Amino acid sequence: MVTVLAALVVGVGGTLAVERTLLSPNATDDVADICGGTAVSADVGPVTRNIPSNPPMTSSWVDYARDGSLLENCTVSVGRTQVLRVTANLERGSTADWERFTKSQIPGAAGPKMAFDAGDRAVSYEKDAAIHVPCTLPRNQPKNDDGKAITTYVAVVAHASGAAVEENDKRRQDLAYLASRVAEHAHSTMRCKEPLNIPDGAPKVGSVG
């Protein structure tokens, strides 16, 4: 049996975010509900391959978007150990700023850096994936002191602890897929003006970044 807990969480400035927690006695039960269903779509394999199949799990999904702010945070834990995390944030700056942001989120990234086809830029490591999605807001675009519009983008980062037994190449593919699904959801949520460059299925990982 799966227990679902939902709550309204007070965010910055008194705004509300939806937080949804899934408690399951088995890590493969109702896995389609993970991340509010956002990151799974019709394929649960990328999730189940990255979480142990025996211990109970807890999955939390926070989806907050208001007034040009975005926070999407999906975590899966087994016991007290976090085994999977996917986040999306609206950030300001250039691609170089995104690269610095990504390094701050995955400072210990292991394995060769590779590219995959998603967003404006996307990089893959053995246990991490990150996507840069250009995102000009439909209204209230932030401006600098000179009145010029500030470039904004959605930064998506996915991380798996490697607690589940999975080959590195397959884990790369799964994390690229999960990051892409959350990027797709974030792009729709923020109504970014730029066309969405996210493949329907799993992105191709392989070219060296």
Language model regions located:
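A small/polar (G/S/T-enriched), proline-flanked helix-loop surface module common
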Residues: 20-184, 188, 195-208
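Hydrophobic membrane-insertion alpha-helices, especially the h-region
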Residues: 1-20
